[in-house]
């Protein structure tokens, strides 16, 4: 049987690239940046087969520059304006997570205790985070190891490798299980 070239719909990869206003290369793959109506809408961790994409607007360009600065220097502080998204509970979780210092990790249980909630609910709020890096959910781990990341089942291990890279980049001690957690929120 012979096949000939024909016009075909966009592949899922091409469709995925099209939704982003910019794509920044990263040591673990790429980071997709989506803007809409003058607001940042999403930062997404993308596998290595995504190609870089120049910013399509000024806000995407600003986000690209800040992501690149963070990737070069873990001490960089983001100044991107984030739209108010999520429930009041999710915002409480994200606020607590934003206070975790670089190079440190906290468990889902520690965050839950701090805000008066349950660890599973904290994990669900982490998975609903549209702005990872800026709201650093990678700094929240399970009591006995990395736990999940970005609400993905992660059979490929990609998202956990991103979490591991981010924590290493920020200087978090990854050796040893269970994790040695620092006291916080007395």
What positions do the PLM features span?
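Nucleic acid-binding interface residues in structured DNA/RNA-binding domains
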Residues: 16-19, 27, 76-186
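Beta-strand scaffold of nucleotide-dependent catalytic cores
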Residues: 22, 42-44, 149
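Short secondary-structure junctions
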Residues: 12, 52-55, 173
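DNA-contacting interfaces and partner/effector-binding or oligomerization modules
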Residues: 2-35
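Structural motif
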Residues: 30, 39-40, 139
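General helical structural elements
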Residues: 6, 38, 167-168
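Compact structured core domains
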Residues: 34-79
């Amino acid at each position: 049987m012979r096949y000939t070239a024909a016009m075909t719909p966009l592949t899922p990869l091409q469709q995925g690239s099209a939704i982003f206003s910019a794509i920044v290369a990263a040591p673990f793959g790429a980071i997709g940046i989506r803007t809409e109506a003058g607001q940042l809408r999403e930062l997404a961790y993308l596998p290595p087969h995504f190609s870089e994409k120049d910013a399509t607007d000024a806000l995407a360009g600003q986000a690209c520059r800040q992501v690149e600065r963070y990737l070069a220097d873990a001490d960089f502080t983001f100044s991107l304006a984030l739209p108010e998204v999520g429930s009041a509970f999710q915002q409480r979780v994200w606020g607590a997570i934003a206070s975790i210092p670089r190079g440190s990790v906290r468990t889902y249980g520690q965050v839950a205790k701090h805000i008066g909630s349950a660890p599973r609910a904290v994990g669900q709020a982490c998975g609903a985070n549209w702005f990872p890096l800026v709201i650093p959910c990678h700094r929240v781990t399970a009591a006995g190891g990395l736990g999940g990341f970005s609400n993905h089942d992660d059979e490929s291990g990609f998202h956990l490798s991103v979490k591991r890279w981010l924590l290493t980049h920020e200087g978090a001690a990854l050796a040893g299980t269970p994790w040695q957690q620092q006291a916080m929120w007395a």
